Amino acid sequence: MAQEQTKRGGGGGDDEDVTGTTAAGQERREKLAQDTDDLLDEIDDVLEENAEDFVRAYVQKGGQ
């Protein structure tokens, strides 16, 4: 079977659009990184307070 290949060129356009998109993407990455750090801190707090119950909740029953 023959496969068709298509090439797409960059649309050209304004560099300001790219800069705005890049800045928005950077903001989003920073926000997600902060949210991830907050979640990991919360998990650490739970583990410090009650690690045994946390582990027990994830142990599979029946020797599996």
Curated annotation (Swiss-Prot):
The answer to whether the entry has keyword Coiled coil is yes
Q: Which residues form a coiled coil?
A: 25-52
InterPro entries in the record? Ubiquitin-like_Pup (IPR008515)
Positions carrying Deamidated glutamine are Q64
Isoglutamyl lysine isopeptide (Gln-Lys) (interchain with K-? in acceptor proteins) crosslink location in chain: Q64
In terms of superkingdom, the source organism counts as Bacteria
Kindly state the subunit structure of this protein: Strongly interacts with the proteasome-associated ATPase ARC through a hydrophobic interface; the interacting region of Pup lies in its C-terminal half. There is one Pup binding site per ARC hexamer ring.
Reported function: Protein modifier that is covalently attached to lysine residues of substrate proteins, thereby targeting them for proteasomal degradation. The tagging system is termed pupylation.
Protein name listed in UniProt? Prokaryotic ubiquitin-like protein Pup
Upper taxonomic classification of the species? Bacteria, Bacillati, Actinomycetota, Actinomycetes, Mycobacteriales
